[in-house]
């Protein structure tokens, strides 16, 4: 009886939950985040953003355009958690097992590229691009503040060049 329960638990951990998470993430890719207070659909929001007559003031029109533009960057916490979990499961399943047979056969290039991409997606936080407008150049002085040769000659009594240059 315990063996059956252990096998069912292993089956759930290996197959059921990762595939369920993968299905949830795959189904939710490309869909905008649905807010709880707004019951509009995609067609209504696109029609409303294109209808200039409904926006009475220009600042409201700008806010509508910015909200439509920013909606692709808003990611729900649980959606992001599910994506990271699926990426982690995929990266563990694609990692080769350490054995003598697996060590002799190298991984194909596409598997290595996929592992690198999954690692980058898992470790780097996605942020929208930001334009940096105010940049200042650093002032670099051409003459060094401290001459080692002068210090050696004055403090230690060691001459590091001709006597006319040191005095």
From Swiss-Prot:
A molecular function (GO) term: translation regulator activity
Positions in coiled-coil regions: none
GO cellular component terms given for this protein: cytosol; periplasmic space
Localization of this protein: Cytoplasm, Cytosol; Periplasm
InterPro entries (UniProt xref): SecM
Keywords: Cytoplasm, Periplasm, Signal
Pfam families (alphabetical): SecM
Signal peptide: 1-36
Family: Belongs to the SecM family.
Function: Regulates secA expression by translational coupling of the secM secA operon. Translational pausing at a specific Pro residue 5 residues before the end of the protein may allow disruption of a mRNA repressor helix that normally suppresses secA translation initiation.
Identification of the protein by name: Secretion monitor
Organism: Erwinia tasmaniensis (strain DSM 17950 / CFBP 7177 / CIP 109463 / NCPPB 4357 / Et1/99)
Name of encoding gene: secM
